[in-house]
Amino acid sequence: MLFGRLTERAQRVLAHAQEEAIRLNHSNIGTEHLLLGLMKEPEGIAAKVLESFNITEDKVIEEVEKLIGHGQDQTGTLHYTPRAKKVIELSMDEARKLHHNFVGTEHILLGLIRENEGVAARVFANLDLNITKARAQVVKALGSPEMSNKNATANKSNNTPTLDGLARDLTVIAKDGTLDPVVGRDKEITRVIEVLSRRTKNNPVLIGEPGVGKTAIAEGLAQAIVNNEVPETLKGKRVMSLDMGTVVAGTKYRGEFEERLKKVMEEIHQAGNVILFIDELHTLVGAGGAEGAIDASNILKPALARGELQCIGATTLDEYRKNIEKDAALERRFQPIQVDEPTVEDTIAILKGLRDRYEAHHRINISDEALEAAAKLSDCYVSDRFLPDKAIDLIDEASSKVRLKSHTTPNNLKEIEQEIEKVKNEKDAAVHAQEFENAANLRDKQTKLEKQYEDAKNEWKTTQGDQSTSLSKEDIGEVIAGWTGIPLTKINETESDRLLNLEQTLHDRVIGQNDAVTSISKAVRRARAGLKDPKRPIGSFIFLGPTGVGKTELARALAESMFGEEDAMIRVDMSEFMEKHAVSRLVGAPPGYVGHDEGGQLTEKVRRKPYSVILFDEIEKAHPDVFNILLQVLDDGHLTDTKGRQVDFRNTVIIMTSNVGAQELQDQRFAGFGGGSEGHDYETIRKTMMKELKNSFRPEFLNRVDDIIVFHKLSKDELKEIVTMMVNKLTQRLSEQDINIVVTDKAKEKIAEEGYDPEYGARPLIRAIQKTVEDNLSELILDGNQIEGKEVVIDHDGDEFKYNINEKNNGISDEGNEVTETEA
């Protein structure tokens, strides 16, 4: 907290506040202790103003002890509560508004008055202090000394009126204490001071990625000037932040912009104590240069070269390269200073420096573990932004979320409010109907409810009081999960059970294939428990096997179990990438080609959904160059698109399916179903497919894959299970049209028999169901049979399929409603 600007009396107030907290055995210094501290300084303006309202020290002590009482024996260091910190911030704000250079007891009192929550506010309410009159009394007691300060400030800057209207004086803002502290940038600030102290071309330009803290360095320089931590050459200088948009705004006629900029330059030259700071320096190039007029950069060049104008610029690497470097004459007038992204450790130090500001704003406590989690998790999971900006935003949003959650009006208050509104409407209706006795009863009921509401509200506020809400590591995880979709919160019991039973969930959709299901499930559990390699994808797999055994279906089932819907899967059909030139569509077209601005089909989807299942279907159909792109994805977990953006694949499950070797198996008569024993068949299939896989793909590609799984052929029993699954899906579809079908076991066996094909796996079952069930049902409907609201029983008598139409839930077949397959 910024206590350097407090008067001696105000500092004594804070010391008294600490003593009062110790006397009352409280573990924190709150607003009530600040109030007691004010009362301990009877000669201060604050105490005198309160005394004029008949508020004495004894009364305040009595109220405080009544409201919160004495605590237990307190140990350790005393800390200010977030609300007390907010009061100090408000008191500084009051001093700035009154143009006072220091914070006194009167400003602390104004801060307490503005902070309308907390124990001090309740003490004022209990002692019937009129807040508006008290504030007016403080301002009156101050008299007019502030006007002299105001005039002094005005006189200091009245020699630069144009500049003052277009720029912000960072040194004045730093003096007011409203700039955030700058942590860990001493090296860069020293380098800026060295360049500014040169005789000519003394213009540093801060170059770095967005969000690394370039503007903060200029603010740090302003704070160093205010604190006299600069060489003699820079003492007394003013750092003015100029926005080129403001300079251009309103210049309707030719020459107005140039005249305005020239006037600013003349004022800076005459004042001799101004350092100009231009954020987004690249906006100089072309600014005000419409219709052949000279732009801002060309107007400033002579003054920049001669050293008449000291300018600090800030811009990103890309903008510097595109706008500044192409103008060699402008580039040589600036000295580049590289501002690198801070490390995670440096970011934690920066967050600790900013903690007080965010605690005071959100009125919560921010723990060290929350700061560390914000730095580490944002570094790990938010790959398209830079530290410390993304970590600061994370702390800010998480603090806001916690604050709002803890201060939401409880349900019982909302219910009483609704009841009051209801009674009020009934009372108005009774008055309108001239039922005055009923209206009087309702009025009494309303009064009773309003009293009940006030009591409940006061009780809720009392429990809230100065109770400190803390920001934890879990809160940070929740917010970053909301940003990215990656689950980072603590695993709860429900999710734990779901992960442990993932195999069973997948088996509900994928029949057989235990090896594949187990391998996938283990990879997902490793990732969710935080044990996976942080630099690689969650898992990468190649699924081999003949067609129709469930390779693609397993990927769909995994997407549904992880995200609740199949559409969450990113599917890339590799048959679309058979030509060499089509490979670029994955990462985006190169510059100069059509579609460069659209991004890649794969990279754009993963950028938007970094936590996903990616299915590369039928990989043997793709051009070999595709697998060169996948090498770095499998090994390093990232891919760079054509715009130079790094796309993070570390939170994806990569599944590749292939039928490689299936043709050779068919030639060997081992594909599909039947043949020798199950074990012998599987080993032959496995050896053949692995051999073909090694012939088709490079070893460096296969070596990067976590697991290569050969799918088993499907047995007849498994086929029957698949038929049951397919029939259930059909039943669900038909139930939406109020048609209920029942397929008997005999019919299912016949469908499985008809759909049995050693070459094509389970896919012929779809055709068999279409032929035996869907086609005949559609003919029944078109033939005039009213089957809506009825039950259709599909059976097989050994020769043909039979369709019995029953009344729903009747259980008795109507003799005249039996239809054979041939009749249908």
Swiss-Prot record:
Gene3D superfamilies: 1.10.8.60, Clp, N-terminal domain, P-loop containing nucleotide triphosphate hydrolases, UVR domain. Residues 471-662 are annotated as: II. ATP binds at residues 208-215, 545-552. Residues 3-144 form the Clp R domain. GO terms for cellular component: cytoplasm. Residues 163-410 are annotated as: I. Keywords: ATP-binding, Chaperone, Nucleotide-binding, Repeat, Stress response. Residues 6-71 are annotated as: Repeat 1. This is ATP-dependent Clp protease ATP-binding subunit ClpC. It comes from Staphylococcus haemolyticus (strain JCSC1435). The gene is clpC.
